[in-house]
């Protein structure tokens, strides 16, 4: 009952999925030219808003997600709270290990530390969350302008989370909801993805949102 309509984007020609009777409406979008992550979700949002009865909430979902219990009921409760910009679940691996989906602000120094000495503990400050599973109030996603489509892949989730917080919205962690996400880490393995990642980081670090967020970001209190 939590899901009203699902939009499936076919970013390149592929066989259609086997028809199944779902308890919600399923609609497909077919791109003539492959688009980036943010552009695809913005397109789905525009189509949803054009429906006769558009949903009050909009979920961004990766195709490699799974779950054993419906995560949407607790996510909807969290996203309906005052000042909620988006709600997100706990992400775990197929072996039930907690993913590092909550991150601190990426800087050249922090990324170097991450690759030289990986630390998978929860960061002292959560500045952004990966966009594998996010639930937005539709009015918030619309007013914030959705994803910045200049980010073809990578960092569009960082940019969106920073812009949400600059507008006074909160990133709502929802411990009652859990999804399984097998992160591909393609930028660690494929040169093309690595170049996309580097280009997106360069764009992020030179963006107005990044500069504004760093200026207003207060130092963490040491315990």
Name each model feature, range by range.
Residues 40-41, 69-74, 157:
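Acidic donor-diphosphate engagement hotspot in glycosyltransferases and nucleotidyltransferases
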Residues 54-66:
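Short beta-strand-to-loop acidic/aromatic patch adjacent to the donor-nucleotide binding site
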């Amino acid at each position: 009952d939590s899901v009203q309509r699902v939009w499936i984007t076919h970013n390149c020609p592929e066989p259609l999925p086997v028809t199944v009777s779902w308890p919600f409406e399923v609609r497909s979008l077919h791109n003539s030219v492959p688009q980036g992550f943010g552009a695809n979700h913005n397109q789905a949002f525009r189509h949803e808003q054009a429906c006769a009865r558009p949903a009050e909430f909009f979920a961004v979902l990766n195709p490699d997600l799974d779950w054993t219990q419906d995560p949407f009921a607790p996510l909807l409760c969290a996203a309906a709270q005052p000042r909620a910009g988006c709600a997100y679940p706990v992400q775990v691996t197929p072996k039930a290990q907690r993913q590092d989906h909550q991150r601190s602000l990426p800087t050249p120094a922090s990324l170097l530390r991450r690759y030289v000495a990986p630390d998978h503990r929860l960061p002292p400050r959560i500045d952004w969350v990966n966009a594998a599973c996010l639930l937005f109030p539709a009015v918030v996603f619309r007013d914030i302008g959705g994803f910045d489509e200049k980010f073809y892949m990578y960092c569009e989730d960082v940019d969106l989370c920073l812009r949400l917080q600059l507008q006074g919205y909160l990133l709502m962690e929802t411990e009652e909801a859990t999804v399984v996400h097998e992160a591909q880490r393609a930028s660690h393995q494929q040169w093309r993805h690595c170049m996309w990642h580097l280009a997106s980081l360069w764009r992020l670090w030179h963006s107005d949102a990044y500069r504004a967020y760093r200026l207003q970001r207060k130092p963490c209190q040491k315990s």
